[in-house]
Protein backbone atom coordinates (compact mmCIF):
# COMPACT_ATOMS: atom_id res chain seq x y z
CA UNK A 1 0.00 0.00 0.00
CA UNK A 2 2.78 2.44 0.94
CA UNK A 3 4.63 1.61 -2.29
CA UNK A 4 1.52 2.52 -4.29
CA UNK A 5 1.32 5.88 -2.47
CA UNK A 6 4.99 6.48 -3.28
CA UNK A 7 4.41 5.72 -6.95
CA UNK A 8 1.44 8.10 -6.97
CA UNK A 9 3.59 10.81 -5.36
CA UNK A 10 6.30 10.32 -7.99
CA UNK A 11 3.72 10.50 -10.78
CA UNK A 12 2.20 13.62 -9.22
CA UNK A 13 5.64 15.18 -9.04
CA UNK A 14 6.27 14.33 -12.69
CA UNK A 15 2.94 15.89 -13.63
CA UNK A 16 3.76 18.99 -11.59
CA UNK A 17 7.15 19.17 -13.28
CA UNK A 18 5.52 19.07 -16.68
CA UNK A 19 2.66 21.41 -15.82
CA UNK A 20 4.66 24.12 -14.10
CA UNK A 21 7.60 24.34 -16.43
CA UNK A 22 5.96 24.87 -19.80
CA UNK A 23 7.92 28.02 -20.48
CA UNK A 24 10.80 27.25 -18.19
CA UNK A 25 13.55 26.05 -20.49
CA UNK A 26 13.82 29.30 -22.43
CA UNK A 27 16.90 29.65 -24.60
CA UNK A 28 19.51 28.32 -22.21
CA UNK A 29 22.64 26.95 -23.87
CA UNK A 30 23.87 24.05 -21.74
CA UNK A 31 27.30 24.64 -20.26
CA UNK A 32 30.03 22.02 -20.10
CA UNK A 33 30.88 20.73 -16.64
CA UNK A 34 34.45 19.78 -15.75
CA UNK A 35 34.16 16.50 -13.84
CA UNK A 36 37.79 15.33 -14.14
CA UNK A 37 38.27 15.62 -10.36
CA UNK A 38 35.49 13.10 -9.69
CA UNK A 39 35.77 9.31 -9.79
CA UNK A 40 34.76 8.39 -13.35
CA UNK A 41 31.66 6.22 -13.61
CA UNK A 42 31.99 4.70 -17.06
CA UNK A 43 29.40 4.33 -19.78
CA UNK A 44 26.81 2.32 -17.84
CA UNK A 45 24.47 4.68 -15.98
CA UNK A 46 24.19 4.10 -12.24
CA UNK A 47 20.80 3.54 -10.62
CA UNK A 48 21.74 5.48 -7.50
CA UNK A 49 23.76 8.59 -6.81
CA UNK A 50 27.36 7.43 -6.30
CA UNK A 51 28.45 10.89 -5.13
CA UNK A 52 26.08 11.29 -2.18
CA UNK A 53 27.83 13.46 0.48
CA UNK A 54 30.99 13.73 -1.66
CA UNK A 55 32.26 17.27 -0.99
CA UNK A 56 34.04 17.62 -4.34
CA UNK A 57 30.92 16.44 -6.20
CA UNK A 58 28.75 18.85 -4.20
CA UNK A 59 31.00 21.77 -5.14
CA UNK A 60 31.07 20.79 -8.83
CA UNK A 61 27.34 20.05 -8.77
CA UNK A 62 26.51 23.45 -7.28
CA UNK A 63 28.41 25.23 -10.02
CA UNK A 64 26.88 22.99 -12.70
CA UNK A 65 23.38 23.58 -11.30
CA UNK A 66 23.79 27.35 -11.33
CA UNK A 67 25.09 27.24 -14.92
CA UNK A 68 22.58 24.78 -16.36
CA UNK A 69 19.52 24.54 -14.13
CA UNK A 70 19.10 27.76 -12.15
CA UNK A 71 17.45 29.71 -14.95
CA UNK A 72 14.38 27.53 -14.54
CA UNK A 73 14.75 26.01 -11.07
CA UNK A 74 16.18 29.11 -9.32
CA UNK A 75 19.57 30.04 -7.92
CA UNK A 76 20.64 27.60 -5.23
CA UNK A 77 17.57 25.51 -6.17
CA UNK A 78 15.11 28.06 -4.73
CA UNK A 79 12.42 28.08 -7.40
CA UNK A 80 10.71 31.30 -8.34
CA UNK A 81 7.63 29.35 -9.35
CA UNK A 82 8.37 28.68 -13.02
CA UNK A 83 9.71 25.16 -12.55
CA UNK A 84 9.54 22.70 -9.64
CA UNK A 85 11.40 23.56 -6.46
CA UNK A 86 14.04 20.84 -6.42
CA UNK A 87 14.66 21.25 -2.69
CA UNK A 88 11.43 19.28 -2.31
CA UNK A 89 12.48 16.43 -4.60
CA UNK A 90 13.00 13.92 -1.77
CA UNK A 91 10.39 15.25 0.70
CA UNK A 92 8.28 12.10 0.54
CA UNK A 93 11.33 10.02 1.43
CA UNK A 94 12.24 12.25 4.38
CA UNK A 95 8.85 11.65 6.01
CA UNK A 96 9.33 7.87 6.11
CA UNK A 97 10.33 6.41 9.49
CA UNK A 98 11.30 2.93 8.33
CA UNK A 99 14.93 3.07 7.12
CA UNK A 100 14.44 0.27 4.57
CA UNK A 101 11.47 2.08 3.02
CA UNK A 102 13.33 5.39 3.15
CA UNK A 103 16.30 3.84 1.34
CA UNK A 104 14.01 2.35 -1.32
CA UNK A 105 12.30 5.72 -1.73
CA UNK A 106 15.63 7.54 -2.20
CA UNK A 107 16.65 4.92 -4.76
CA UNK A 108 13.41 5.42 -6.70
CA UNK A 109 13.87 9.19 -6.60
CA UNK A 110 17.43 8.82 -7.92
CA UNK A 111 16.05 6.82 -10.85
CA UNK A 112 13.30 9.40 -11.48
CA UNK A 113 15.78 12.29 -11.29
CA UNK A 114 18.30 10.70 -13.69
CA UNK A 115 15.55 9.88 -16.18
CA UNK A 116 14.11 13.42 -16.06
CA UNK A 117 17.52 15.04 -16.56
CA UNK A 118 18.68 12.65 -19.27
CA UNK A 119 15.50 12.50 -21.33
CA UNK A 120 13.80 15.76 -20.40
CA UNK A 121 10.05 16.11 -20.15
CA UNK A 122 7.71 16.45 -23.11
CA UNK A 123 3.93 16.33 -23.19
CA UNK A 124 1.75 16.61 -26.29
CA UNK A 125 4.80 17.68 -28.26
CA UNK A 126 5.64 20.57 -25.91
CA UNK A 127 9.04 20.51 -24.21
CA UNK A 128 8.70 21.26 -20.51
CA UNK A 129 12.31 20.41 -19.74
CA UNK A 130 15.01 19.87 -22.34
CA UNK A 131 16.97 16.61 -22.34
CA UNK A 132 20.55 16.86 -21.13
CA UNK A 133 21.76 13.42 -22.22
CA UNK A 134 24.68 13.96 -24.55
CA UNK A 135 25.30 17.39 -23.01
CA UNK A 136 25.91 16.52 -19.36
CA UNK A 137 27.82 13.35 -18.62
CA UNK A 138 26.83 10.92 -15.89
CA UNK A 139 29.34 12.44 -13.48
CA UNK A 140 27.82 15.93 -13.94
CA UNK A 141 24.24 14.68 -13.54
CA UNK A 142 25.04 12.87 -10.29
CA UNK A 143 27.16 15.77 -9.00
CA UNK A 144 24.15 18.05 -9.47
CA UNK A 145 22.01 15.56 -7.54
CA UNK A 146 24.62 15.49 -4.75
CA UNK A 147 24.38 19.29 -4.60
CA UNK A 148 20.56 19.19 -4.57
CA UNK A 149 20.68 16.78 -1.64
CA UNK A 150 22.43 19.52 0.39
CA UNK A 151 19.55 21.89 -0.44
CA UNK A 152 16.76 19.58 0.76
CA UNK A 153 13.83 21.20 2.47
CA UNK A 154 13.50 18.21 4.81
CA UNK A 155 16.72 16.39 5.73
CA UNK A 156 16.79 12.62 5.40
Predicted regions and their residues:
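Electrostatic cytochrome c docking/interface patches
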Residues: 30-64
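The canonical Cys-X-X-Cys-His
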Residues: 61, 65-75, 129, 144-148
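Gly/Gly-Pro-rich "capping" loops immediately C-terminal to redox-active cysteine motifs
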Residues: 60-62, 78-118, 128
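Soluble non-cytosolic domains of exported or imported proteins
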Residues: 55, 59, 63, 107, ...
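Short, linear, compositionally biased motifs with a strong N-terminal bias
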Residues: 15-16
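Bacterial N-terminal signal peptides that target proteins for export
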Residues: 1-10
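Axial heme c-ligation environment in periplasmic c-type cytochrome domains
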Residues: 25-32, 51, 80-89, 116-152, ...
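N-terminal signal peptide c-region/cleavage motif recognized by signal peptidases
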Residues: 19-21
